[in-house]
């Protein structure tokens, strides 16, 4: 682990300060606003938290590639019984993730013995990232479904659910002009993608929220929470209830781990 910690130190002391000074992608600005206005921190605390936030992000990127290289982290799981309960049923189910912590480091540790795991990932990644991920996941019955512009990935998602498999997808970012659902998060309105909510309610799927948070240099903690909604209610009410449940869990984790918020853009509109 010394090599990883040396990388942590190098990025903390040299890389992050330069990135924050340049602020080329406005991550410093958006992170500061998040801490100042959404978390309610004072100016000095918000500025310091912005630095720590970027340091944590760099560490998680390092951890991600360390996993691809075969490194092992200690994994704690809270709420695993919810996953086991749904896995034991005949029907498949869905998992909603978010851009907090690092789902990829430990989220795929929720391995099913009976159902194939399908993970929706954004296309356009570098070949080294894709190759590294496939190397790690090839023996775990996990299929990666890249998000494509022609929307063909939706057919694979529907096929997987029709085959009673598990489908995992991020549920916090609206891409392009996609349909959205407006909901309050940390005291202000946010547009959440309607796609994951729509698919889940249309297919009458059970849904888990899974968030993976870094708790130390060697350890991540996986939080599994079953999201509730009334499948007998109208479709509109179902979508609202499921959104409420997802956002409530997201806000709980963001309050608990404020430094691990990694949506580096104007998330609140």
Language-model features: locations:
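Active-site metal-coordination segments of metallo-dependent hydrolases
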Residues: 24-33, 125-127, 189-193
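Hydrophobic alpha-helical segments typical of transmembrane helices
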Residues: 30-31, 106, 132-133, 195, ...
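Short amphipathic alpha-helical segments and helix-helix/interface helices
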Residues: 83-84, 107-108, 133-134, 157-158, ...
């Amino acid at each position: 682990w010394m090599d990883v910690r040396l990388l942590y130190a190098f990025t903390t002391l040299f890389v992050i300060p330069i990135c924050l000074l340049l602020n080329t992608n406005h991550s410093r600005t958006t992170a500061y606003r998040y801490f100042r206005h959404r978390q309610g921190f004072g100016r000095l605390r918000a500025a310091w938290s912005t630095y720590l936030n970027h340091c944590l992000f760099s560490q998680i990127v390092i951890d991600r590639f360390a996993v691809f290289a075969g490194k092992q982290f200690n994994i704690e799981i809270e709420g695993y019984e919810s996953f086991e309960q749904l896995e034991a049923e005949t029907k498949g189910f869905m998992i909603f993730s978010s851009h907090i912590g690092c789902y990829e480091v430990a989220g795929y540790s929720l391995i099913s013995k009976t159902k194939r795991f399908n993970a929706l990932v954004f296309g356009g990644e570098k070949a080294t990232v894709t190759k590294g991920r496939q190397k790690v996941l090839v023996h775990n019955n996990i299929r990666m479904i890249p998000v494509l512009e022609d929307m063909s990935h939706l057919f694979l998602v529907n096929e997987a659910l029709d085959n009673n498999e598990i489908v995992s997808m991020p549920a916090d970012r609206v891409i392009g002009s996609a349909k959205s659902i407006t909901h309050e998060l940390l005291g202000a309105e946010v547009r959440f993608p309607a796609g994951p909510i729509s698919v889940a309610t249309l297919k009458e799927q059970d849904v888990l929220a899974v968030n993976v948070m870094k708790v130390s240099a060697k350890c991540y903690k996986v939080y599994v929470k079953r999201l509730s909604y009334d499948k007998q209610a109208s479709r509109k009410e179902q979508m609202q209830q499921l959104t409420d449940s997802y956002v409530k869990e997201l806000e709980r984790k963001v309050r608990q781990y404020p430094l691990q918020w990694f949506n580096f853009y104007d998330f609140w509109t």
